[in-house]
Every structure is written in structure tokens, then in C-alpha cells.
């Protein structure tokens, strides 16, 4: 911009050029960007392919979006439960508002977790920013993603697809723990959240959730 101001100032160019087009320049500014885009595209396609390729999973988790909470299943362990946001009046010290849930996802550290994502009603999106994960939850379709967390801790996410009046009240809470703690949790979870026993309770919770609307 400064170069143009100096180069084509009135003092140096009392009679301005009236050139309307230049074929060579037009060809160059069309061809050169195309070449650059092609060069960038080759490694980009490789990265996109790798991004969609899921490594062999150590843990498989299924996330089902409902209006307005998440349901989870560990199909290999026959575990199923719902995860509902804790209301303000029920929060305990240290629990973040609009993010804490009554039942948490638990996964082991340094393990590949494959997530199968779907919906039971409208479109939702399962997103945990710290994992770099966001996938749409669509009824009748299963989308896949994965993550591998290298640090123990509590990670939060939310539904990222506008899904109704309580869209903002669909948090995701993931506890990443050691393998020993995960094994202990599995023992308790298999007793508390056995998939067959949870079918009726899940239907009841759905009904109650709708009645609160």
C-alpha cells in the first residue's frame, strides 16, 4: 500500500495510466494462487485422512443425545447410564455451574477412547474442547471420533448444536483417572449401571425430563 502511494503519487505521475487490464498479470494472479492451493492440498488431504482414522480403541463409549441430557453406554462392559446437569441449588462446593453432572464419564489415562455418537431425537453435538473433539449427534446415524488424554483430571464440554430451549443445560463431564481407579470404577459401575437393569429407569427419566418442560 505504501509502495503504491509513493510509486503512483501525483507528483511523479501527472498523467495517470489509463490501462484497464493486463493479460499477463491477470494470468499470473490466477495461476499462482491455484498452484499454491494445490501444493497445500496434498498434505492437507493426508492430514484429513489421518484425522478420520481411529486407532485401535482401548475403551469404547457410546454417547446418545436427548432433549436435554446425555445418555452413555460402555458396550464392551454392558454399562449404561444418563448424565444430567446438576441444578444450581444442588451444587456442591467446587462444582462448576452449568457444567457439573450427576453421573460422570470415567476413562483411563493414556488410553485410546473411541466415541460413538448418535441422537434419540433432534440434532445435538458432543464437544469437549480440551480433547479437540466435536461431532454431530444425529438420529439414525452413528458418528465416530476418538481421544487419548495424557493427563489425569476433570474435563468439561457441552452440547454444541442448538437443540431446543434447554440446549445450554447439556454439559459433558469426563473424569480421566489412572488404570487402577478405572478398574475399580468399572467394578462398581457394572453393579450400579448394568445395561439390562437400566432400560426401565432410562425410560422413566426421559418422561420426567419432558414433564419439566
PLM segments and residue spans:
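Non-transmembrane, membrane-proximal soluble domains of secreted or membrane proteins
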Residues: 2-213
